[in-house]
Amino acid sequence: MAESPLEIHVIADSTGETAVRLARAARSQFEGVHWHIVRHPMIGTVPEMVSALEAVSEAHEAGQWVCVVHTLVLPDMRRMVSDACEEMGIRELDLMGPMLEAMEEASGLDADAVPRRPVGVEADYFTRISAMEFAVRNDDGAIPDRLTEADICLVGVSRSGKTPLSIYLGYLGYKTVNVPLVPGIAPPTELAAVDRWRIVGLTIDAQRLLEIRGRRVRGLGGFGNEDGYADLAAIYEELDEVGKIQRRLGCPIIDTTGLALEESATKVIDVVDQRAKTAGTRLRKPAGSYRMRP
């Protein structure tokens, strides 16, 4: 491990947030190494660029490992960084140039090359905010009358991951509700009005559920363990009974044990999307939606 921070210098003609996020994502893959991100934003003139490159040079001459990541619209500015880094023997990553060149080639047009041009609010920004608020307001089936407004409806035992998954699906732009299923208690009658293809059951390994519930009970000072809430034998029975309810509902069941939130979300979206097609309809796609395949 390096004795001093390894420096990633971000040079940008705007905020530099795009490059910073990429640098942070890459940095997360190196545990135990101290990577320091140095930002040089709003670089619009040659003197400003010279000042930024001097800071890079000083760090390099001090014996630190340094690399430069930049998002610059103007070709001359990109060339200035590239030439300086080559002269200093420093690794340099141009995030903007190759993208602009590819788009110019594909469109047959020249880029406007206007620094600091506002990119505007994402087309799906307000959709995502609204969907996340919807998930929070309708957590644990709080407002049964609104179940039919959801794009996706999650059903399962308490602490099977329904709430965080609902909010994450909301972040992706899908209005999601979650309904707790409890043995001996009938699901809300409003659930019958929800399209079958929208409903997904969640389950989880009994031992894992015991660990999660045990932490919650300890956090409450031992309260909340009534009716075997954190008892393994009772949990096995609960999962079995809730599984029967889920099968009566005719919904697919996804085991969330060991799955990252993103993986669970992808599985839910895939299964709902496929069931919607089978039903002769389709799951609403949020504007600008995207998701990573596991």
Swiss-Prot record:
| Catalysed reaction equations from the record | N(tele)-phospho-L-histidyl/L-threonyl-[pyruvate, phosphate dikinase] + ADP = N(tele)-phospho-L-histidyl/O-phospho-L-threonyl-[pyruvate, phosphate dikinase] + AMP + H(+); N(tele)-phospho-L-histidyl/O-phospho-L-threonyl-[pyruvate, phosphate dikinase] + phosphate + H(+) = N(tele)-phospho-L-histidyl/L-threonyl-[pyruvate, phosphate dikinase] + diphosphate
Q: Where does ADP bind?
A: G156, V157, S158, R159, S160, G161, K162, T163
Q: Which InterPro entries match?
A: Kinase-pyrophosphorylase, PPDK_reg
Residues folding into a coiled coil are none
Q: Which UniProt keywords apply?
A: Kinase, Nucleotide-binding, Serine/threonine-protein kinase, Transferase
- Keyword Cytoplasm attached: no
Protein's name according to its UniProt entry: Putative pyruvate, phosphate dikinase regulatory protein
